[in-house]
Amino acid sequence: MSEKRKDNRGRILRTGESQRKDGIYQYRYADILGTRRYIYDADLNKLREKEKYVQKQLDQGLDYANGKMTVVELYEQYVDTKRNARENTKKTYAYFAKVLRNDAFSKKEISKVKPLDAKKWLIKLHDSGLSYGTLKVLKAAVGGAFKMACEEDIISKNPCAFSLSSIISNDTTKKEVLSLEQQKAFLSFVRKDAWGSKYYDVIIVLLNTGMRIGELSGLIIDDIDFEKRRIKIDHQLQYYDKNGYVVEKVKSRSGNRMIPMSDDVYESLKRVLNNRKQIEREFEDYVFLNRNGRPITSTAFAISLKRIITKYNNCHQNDQLPNITPHSFRHMFCSNMVKANMNAKTLQYIMGHADISMTLNVYSHIDYDAVEKSMLDILNADN
């Protein structure tokens, strides 16, 4: 019978345990893949507590060694699997990595992160000034990383599997839109304004198609069928300081669609193509160009739109318009169609939404007058 291994204090060591010359205790085990692993501690009793935890993880089929990686290390591994993401999404991932690194939460071992830890972290970020909308996207990204860890059997539960609204009030304000009367007044002003009139057709197309500004920027002549009066949407054009113009896919498969042309849109597109002057050869197929012959960008148009709104408000002291963005026209289009009782599935298709709840809950801005008219038109139809 072999002699039991003992430490320098005469205590019997268990299978897998040993003591190094420097007095540190170590425990050797095989992980779920059969790879040899070690854990260490200067105190034998504390080492045995670690052994129990390791064994519990192994019994559950979890990877203890990878469970010791930190939150930010897990997040970086998760982001590395998203190499096909759009440039905007990559920039968002990079920003969130920076937010993570600036907080002690990022250094916690993922196997030790509890839902309470994640909740406290998000509340702390909200108190520091991050908006509910930003935190919602951040939680989805970090939660996605923890979900990946669950799928890889590194941890058993996702500590971010809770609703953000359960810990933080949704203080997101609805995007500003113009009423139908304001839309008419604004379009009339833009059409007559010496400087703003060059954006009239851009606004007409956005307001009457519901397309995104990136989709409008990316329109090429072949996307427009004047005979059948329809516009093909299957890509968008973005501009990045680092990469310049980048053609990207639409946001989802549902984003591939055909949008019918109204008479106003038909006339605006004809006018835009007939009035093009200076055109860079590289961009000759694009429809909406700036004065330098290059495709318009969302940033440049947003700046110009703000200038037009300011000019309008200076001329209409008693009828001020809210600050709107290029994307506001998409919201207005959706609201206008809902008020006109367009079929919900038809509107979902035109908007390019994968989920109809996005069409009805986020983009439609219905006021009481519209609700009253819709209801009474139905109830009084037979009177």
What are these regions (language model features)?
Residues 23, 136, 151, 155, ...:
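Basic, Lys/Arg- and aromatic-enriched nucleic-acid-binding interface segment
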Residues 132, 188-199, 209, 259, ...:
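Short, basic (Lys/Arg/His-rich) helix/loop patches that form interaction surfaces
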Residues 31, 38-43, 79-154, 172, ...:
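N-terminal core-binding DNA-recognition domain of tyrosine site-specific recombinases/integrases
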Residues 126, 140, 206-208, 338-339:
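Short amphipathic helical patch at the helix-1/turn junction of helix-turn-helix
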Residues 186, 242-248, 340, 361, ...:
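DNA/chromatin major-groove-contacting recognition/catalytic segments
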Residues 1-69, 73-80, 98, 120, ...:
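Basic/aromatic DNA-contact patch characteristic of tyrosine site-specific recombinases
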Residues 169, 177, 237, 351-376:
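Catalytic-site neighborhood detector that most strongly recognizes the C-terminal catalytic loop/helix
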Residues 219-274, 285:
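Conserved tyrosine-mediated DNA breakage-rejoining catalytic core shared by Y-recombinases
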